[in-house]
């Protein structure tokens, strides 16, 4: 009879766990990673909308450069992440959810601002204000110039996009940054966009997660919000 009682207790515990799993799944906390660009101009709005709909769900956010976020996904520290730039790690599943455009910007009085077209060679002849090595933005810019056979040596390297914007506004060189981050400065006239060929700096934005990561229903819903977001 003792073994029978133990068996019944185990069955009861498993049944209780099965009943609780849906409630846990629906209210599971979210651990979301983001690149610096998307953590600056996109993720805050997404989190605000999601938390207005689901105030009971706790959200923990990590914002670092794409390389660091990619490693955090591999190490299973995050449920998923939003990044720009291609991720090739075999343990990561990536999905394009949107796209954005990088802009080459400078102060209105910059010598290239009056040109009808600007070549990569023109840009490389000026001081370049770029993101730090390891960031997706830096990798894209380096690949772009290398495709034209041009090696670059940035005058400024910074993890802070605001520092690069301020440097460009003060006439210290050319910055190459996401349009989302420089939109206000362009509207105010503090910066001007240099006329590169159309679509030369268009890039994809990705949702990434570990291939073995189970996504709760709350995580799935947040990802759906990302897919539907217009910006």
Predicted feature residues:
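Short, small-residue-biased leader/transition segments that mark boundaries at the very start
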Residues: 2-7
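Alpha-helical linker/hinge and terminal dimerization helices associated
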Residues: 8-24
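Central regulatory/effector-binding core of bacterial HTH transcription factors
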Residues: 27-90, 158
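A late-sequence structural motif
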Residues: 42, 192-231
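Hydrophobic hinge/microswitch elements
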Residues: 65-70, 74-78, 83-84, 139-193
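Flexible hinge/capping segments at coil-to-helix
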Residues: 89-102, 106-128, 133, 217
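Beta-alpha-beta core module
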Residues: 89-96, 100, 115, 162-211
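Secondary-structure junction motif
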Residues: 112, 127-148, 215-219, 223
């Amino acid at each position: 009879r003792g073994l029978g009682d133990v068996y019944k207790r185990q069955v009861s515990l498993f049944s209780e766990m099965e009943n609780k799993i849906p409630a846990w799944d629906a209210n599971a906390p979210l651990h979301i990673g983001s690149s610096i660009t998307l953590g600056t101009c996109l993720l805050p709005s997404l989190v605000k909308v999601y938390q207005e709909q689901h105030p009971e769900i706790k959200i923990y956010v990590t914002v670092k450069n794409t390389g660091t976020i990619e490693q955090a996904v591999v190490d299973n520290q995050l449920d998923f992440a939003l990044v720009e730039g291609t991720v090739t790690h075999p343990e990561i599943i990536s999905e394009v959810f949107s796209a954005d455009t990088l802009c080459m910007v400078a102060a209105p009085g910059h010598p290239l601002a009056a040109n009808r077209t600007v070549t990569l060679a023109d840009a490389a002849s000026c001081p370049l204000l770029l993101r730090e090595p390891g960031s997706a933005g830096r990798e894209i810019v380096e690949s772009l110039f290398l495709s034209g056979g041009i090696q670059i040596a940035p005058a400024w390297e910074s993890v802070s996009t605001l520092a690069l914007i301020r440097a460009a506004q003060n006439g210290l060189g050319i910055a190459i940054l996401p349009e989302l981050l420089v939109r206000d400065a362009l509207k105010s006239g503090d910066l001007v966009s240099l006329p590169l060929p159309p679509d030369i700096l268009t890039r994809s934005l990705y949702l990434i997660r570990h291939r073995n990561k189970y996504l709760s229903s709350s995580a799935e819903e947040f990802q759906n919000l990302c897919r539907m977001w217009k910006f």
